[in-house]
UniProtKB/Swiss-Prot annotation:
<keyword id="KW-0539">Nucleus</keyword>
<comment type="subunit">
    <text>Interacts with the GTP-bound form of RALA (via effector domain); during mitosis, recruits RALBP1 to the mitochondrion where it promotes DNM1L phosphorylation and mitochondrial fission. Interacts with DNM1L; mediates its mitotic kinase cyclin B-CDK1-mediated phosphorylation during mitosis to promote mitochondrial fission. Interacts with the mitotic kinase cyclin B-CDK1 during mitosis. Interacts with the GTP-bound form of RALB (via effector domain). Interacts with REPS1; the interaction is direct and does not affect RALA-binding nor GTPase activator activity of RALBP1.</text>
</comment>
<feature type="modified residue" description="Phosphoserine">
    <location>
        <position position="92"/>
    </location>
</feature>
<feature type="modified residue" description="Phosphoserine">
    <location>
        <position position="93"/>
    </location>
</feature>
<feature type="site" description="Arginine finger; crucial for GTP hydrolysis by stabilizing the transition state">
    <location>
        <position position="232"/>
    </location>
</feature>
<dbReference type="GO" id="GO:0015431">
    <property type="term" value="F:ABC-type glutathione S-conjugate transporter activity"/>
</dbReference>
<feature type="compositionally biased region" description="Basic residues">
    <location>
        <begin position="102"/>
        <end position="118"/>
    </location>
</feature>
<dbReference type="GO" id="GO:0005886">
    <property type="term" value="C:plasma membrane"/>
</dbReference>
<feature type="compositionally biased region" description="Polar residues">
    <location>
        <begin position="24"/>
        <end position="33"/>
    </location>
</feature>
<protein>
    <recommendedName>
        <fullName>RalA-binding protein 1</fullName>
        <ecNumber>7.6.2.2</ecNumber>
        <ecNumber>7.6.2.3</ecNumber>
    </recommendedName>
</protein>
<dbReference type="GO" id="GO:0016020">
    <property type="term" value="C:membrane"/>
</dbReference>
<keyword id="KW-0496">Mitochondrion</keyword>
<dbReference type="GO" id="GO:0005096">
    <property type="term" value="F:GTPase activator activity"/>
</dbReference>
<dbReference type="InterPro" id="IPR049041">
    <property type="entry name" value="RalBP1-like_Ral-bd"/>
</dbReference>
<feature type="compositionally biased region" description="Basic and acidic residues">
    <location>
        <begin position="119"/>
        <end position="155"/>
    </location>
</feature>
<dbReference type="InterPro" id="IPR000198">
    <property type="entry name" value="RhoGAP_dom"/>
</dbReference>
<dbReference type="GO" id="GO:0005829">
    <property type="term" value="C:cytosol"/>
</dbReference>
Length: 655
């Protein structure tokens, strides 16, 4: 007989063996050998899923039987004994069930079978492999249980850390798809048709030429006429690309920071990138034919006729270019550039043959005698808010600058209303509005000073002895001007006093709001201090406290920086609002003056239309009542109401 390790007699397996009819022992089923009865049989430390026989069909094999079949396959070669019971080294204790490391050590399982055990019974223990989907579900189920078990042992800091990691992972998934909006993107200035570049960058004076062309021409005319090899020597490529990118973005550039050769190379680059020939494809062969005429007179006449057929933009650009190059040739001693050199440089750039260029350069006066290169005056800038820009002193200069700023303002409005989102253009819009307000204010002051000086000169020229009625009639215009100025000053004073009262009320409400916010801040600070004292012990034990503090510090610095930027924007906005209020006051004053003048004119016209009735003794009946002539003088006396006195207003409202 072979040796067999049997369980105690009180175990249920012994009773089942006794009840069995044959003398052979049978292999225990998966229900008899389960992880709950024999915990040392399995390596895994996780509890097996509940096994419910009632809810399973008879043909389906349970999870415990599948696990048992896998384990039994490992020991299949070792089963050479007759008995099919497993002998354990020691009974598993409660400590082994808790620690998986101890359970791994308890692998000493000895299984004994009879050598005559049939292969048919072995097939009963073979398990069909699960489909991949079921395995995937089981793995997910186990992972979820493992996570639940871990979540019970986590601290608060670990929970916060896991929540942040989940949030970072979910962010790209949860972001909704933003619908694509077709934002109009402006094409660059270089490489677009000449007419489009003119429409986008034309200067305020109405000359239909691109801004980059005019600014380069002006710069070379001013600084490049003494530069040797101008247009022949190439500029620094990086500087040229930098200027090109700035003009493509329609940014204002200062060409005085660059060398003449760099600006000349930029001009050649612009002409080279033009998609169409300056003389057009249709007229270019005819210009070539005109060069073959026998006499110079015929050449000039044919060229004049062909130049008139060119589009306006093309004619202006070719005329300005030839006149400018003629100025360069005239300075041949300094520039070392003659007609041949200029033609060699310009011919491949503008795609015009040397024959045509030679005719242009030799007959500049006949072809372009009336062309004058007008210098570009850039609009005034107010880049630094701390300092006031230098405004023109004369009225003519102020009016010219106002026209430039208004043209620029219209261009900016056109671009922004077209759907182009550009923060630099929005800031430039505010800047132009501030400059316009300052210019209009200075223009009014200049007009007032001119009027005052004129009045003072006229008064000084008069002598007190020669004052007569005729002279008083001559000075009636001066008196009317003085009265109009007085009315304007008084109405302006009334508007300013009304604004003062409004601002005082606003300041009082703002002070109350400040006090309320201070009280809220103090209350929040006290709550924070109380909360910190309660959580000091917990925060000292947390491992991720330093990381949270660093993140909070970074967030705080970011918020402080954003707050500073918002304060700067707020100051700019307040200043703009203040300027707009001043402009509104001035408009109100003008409106009131116009209303007063209109009322006075209507009253005067009404008095002139009233005929004298009954020899002027009695006025015509009004509503059946006769009015004497003395009553006629009453509206005249009440025609001009009592004007407010500035000294009395100052006493009433202390500023």
């Amino acid at each position: 007989m072979t040796e067999c390790f049997l369980p105690p007699t009180s175990s249920p397996s012994e009773h089942r063996r006794v009840e069995h009819g044959s003398g052979l022992t049978r292999t225990p089923s998966s229900e008899e050998i389960s992880p709950t009865k024999f915990p040392g049989l399995y390596r895994t430390g996780e509890p097996s899923p509940p096994h419910d026989i009632l809810h399973e069909p008879p043909d389906v094999v349970s999870d415990d039987e599948k696990d048992h079949g896998k384990k039994k396959g490992k020991f299949k070669k070792k089963e050479k004994r007759t008995e099919g019971y497993a002998a354990f080294q020691e009974d598993s204790s409660g400590d082994e069930a808790e620690s998986p490391s101890k359970m791994k050590r308890s692998k000493g399982i000895h299984v004994f079978k009879k050598p005559s055990f049939s292969k048919k019974k072995e097939k009963d223990f073979k398990i069909k492999e699960k489909p991949k989907e079921e395995k995937h579900k089981e793995e997910k189920h186990k992972e979820e249980k493992h996570k639940e078990k871990k979540s019970k042992d986590l601290t608060a800091a670990d929970v916060v850390k896991q929540w942040k990691e989940k949030k970072k992972k979910k962010k790209p998934i949860q972001e909704p798809e933003v619908p694509q909006i077709d934002v109009p993107n402006l094409k660059p200035i270089f490489g677009i048709p000449l007419a489009d570049a003119v429409e986008r960058t034309m200067m305020y004076d109405g000359i239909r030429l691109p801004a980059v062309f005019r600014e380069c021409i002006d710069y070379v005319e001013k600084y490049g006429m003494k530069c040797e090899g101008i247009y022949r020597v190439s500029g620094i490529k990086s500087k040229v690309d930098e200027l090109k990118a700035a003009y493509d973005r329609e940014e204002s550039t200062n060409l005085e920071d660059y060398e003449p050769n760099t600006v000349a190379s930029l001009l050649k680059q612009y002409l080279r990138d033009l998609p169409e020939n300056l003389l057009t494809k249709e007229l270019m062969p005819r210009f070539e034919e005109a060069c073959g005429r026998t006499t110079e007179t015929e050449k000039v006449q044919e060229f004049q006729r062909l130049l008139k057929e060119l589009p306006e933009c093309n004619y202006l650009l070719i005329s300005w270019l030839i006149v400018h190059m003629d100025h360069v040739i005239a300075k041949e001693l300094e520039t070392k550039m003659n007609i041949q050199n200029i033609s060699i440089v310009l011919s491949p750039t503008v795609q015009i043959s040397n024959r045509v260029l030679y005719v242009f350069f030799t007959h500049v006066q006949e072809l372009f005698g009336n062309v004058v290169l007008k210098q570009v005056m850039k609009p005034l800038r107010w880049s630094n808010m701390a300092t006031m820009p230098t405004l023109p002193e004369t009225q003519a200069g102020i009016k010219e600058e106002i026209r430039r700023q208004e043209f620029l303002l219209n261009c900016l409005h056109r671009d922004l209303q077209g759907g182009i989102k550009d923060l630099s253009k929005e800031e430039r819009l505010w800047e132009v509005q501030r400059i316009l307000t300052a210019l209009k204010r200075k223009l009014r002051e200049a007009k007032r000073q001119e009027c005052e000086t004129k009045i003072a000169q006229e008064i000084a020229s008069l002598s007190k002895e020669d004052v007569s009625k005729e002279e008083m009639n001559e000075n009636e215009e001066v008196i009317n001007i003085l009265l109009a100025q007085e009315n304007e000053i008084l109405t302006e004073q009334e508007e300013l006093l009304a604004m003062e009262q409004f601002l005082r009320r606003q300041i009082a409400s703002e002070k109350e709001e400040i006090e309320r916010l201070r009280a809220e801040i103090a209350e929040i600070q006290s709550r924070q201090q109380h909360g910190r004292s309660e959580t000091e012990e917990y925060s000292s034990e947390s491992e991720s406290e330093s990381e949270d503090e660093e993140e909070l510090q970074i967030i705080l610095e970011d918020l402080q920086r954003q707050n500073e930027e918002l304060e700067i924007k707020n100051n700019h906005l307040n200043q703009a609002i203040h300027e707009e209020r001043e402009a509104i006051i001035e408009l109100r004053v003008q409106l009131r003056l116009l209303q007063m003048q209109r009322a006075k004119a209507e009253q005067q016209a009404q008095e002139d239309e009233e005929p004298e009735w009954r020899g002027g003794a009695v006025q015509p009946p009004r509503d059946g009542v006769l009015e004497p002539k003395a009553a006629k003088e009453q509206p005249k006396a009440g025609k001009e109401p009592a004007k407010p006195s500035p000294s009395r207003d100052r006493k009433e409202t202390s500023i």
